[in-house]
Amino acid sequence: MRIAKIGVIALFLFMALGGIGGVMLAGYTFILRAG
C-alpha cells in the first residue's frame, strides 16, 4: 500500500514537472517568435 501511494505521488509530481516544463517551453518559444 505504501509503495502504491509513493508511486501515485511520484506520478503526479512527474506530471506537474512536465506541465511546468511545457509551459516554460511554450513561453520561451513565444518570446523567441515575438522577438
Swiss-Prot record:
Induction: Constitutively expressed (at protein level). One of its GO terms (cellular component) is plasma membrane. It is a single-pass membrane protein. The chain crosses the membrane at residues 6-26. It is found in: Cell inner membrane. Its main location: membrane. Keywords: Cell inner membrane, Cell membrane, Membrane, Stress response, Transmembrane, Transmembrane helix. Belongs to the UPF0387 family. This is UPF0387 membrane protein YohO. It comes from Escherichia coli (strain K12).
